Amino acid sequence: MIKNVLVQAGDLEFGKKNNLNYTYIGTGSSGYGTINSELDNSFDFKKGSVALSRTEKKNTEDSQFFILLADAPLFEGEYSPVGKVIYGLEVLQKVKYNDKVEYVLRPDFINTFEMLK
């Protein structure tokens, strides 16, 4: 999490609720391989936007994603957008954050979500 900017989730390797690995959380993968970037310059990265996370290199997207807590026009054309949060964004504003380089001992988790067409 970057306070007041974004919340990141989706580390299926090291971020599982029942098997957290604080040393590597945020660096894991899904085990299914990466996908190519699908950059859409017309997508407005506004508060509530959801996009796939990646390494510094493009075409390395996997299971991790982020949700913006504020507008971020610098992300346009840089990250693969997948949608927008239409309900519940206020809950993400309450996600625990630690100002130090320490992990929150009891992190918050996304237990359920629903994708709408």
Task: Please annotate each region the language model reported.
Residues M1-K117:
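Cyclophilin-like peptidyl-prolyl cis-trans isomerases
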